[in-house]
UniProtKB/Swiss-Prot annotation:
Protein family (similarity comment): Belongs to the MATALPHA1 family.
Species whose genome carries this gene: Candida glabrata (strain ATCC 2001 / BCRC 20586 / JCM 3761 / NBRC 0622 / NRRL Y-65 / CBS 138)
Keyword Cytoplasm: no
Gene Ontology molecular function: any one: sequence-specific DNA binding
Localization (cell): Nucleus
Keywords: Activator, DNA-binding, Nucleus, Transcription, Transcription regulation
Record protein name field: Mating-type-like protein ALPHA1
Amino acid sequence: MLTETLTMKYTATKFRVRTNKRLRSQKYPEKHSDFLGCSSTKSSFGLNMLLTKPNKFQIPPPHPVLLKRIREERMKLTSSFESGINIIDIETSWEIDKFISHHFNTSIGNVLKSKSSSKKRPMNAFMAFRTYYAQLGTGLKQNTLSVILSEAWNAPETDQNIWDIFAQQFNFASPRCGFVNYIMAHASSAP
């Protein structure tokens, strides 16, 4: 079942299964807890899963729709700046003293406690796509950028499988650096 799922989704498997011949002749053990990463309730049936060396995938170039829409939004921003209309006027929108005092009065202990107790969500294919290409839209509003990126993601020419592979590799490695830095170091960029 597992191999069917992998072969349907990808063209090549990303791991290899090897049987342990010593345990094949014996009956399956009831509990075998010396398997790495296995709890005492799970059992090993003489299979070793070895990860193969990940392939170097090319980061696909940005979708033309994505580049066109980002250029259009930037043109809107520059035209509104030239006409004298400020997009965000912080001084009139917020009372800065209240804003700053609220953020400085929050307890540091509460902030640290909330960050340590929450689990980090695993990266999925769209999150990987969005994280990488969001750097092209620096300076745009997040809601505008999200709409543009979702349009590019749903375009038929977008290869979603490659972003799924990047996300799986990032989740498996769980590096301390961000996704963009990890991908730049482990994948080759498109021509």
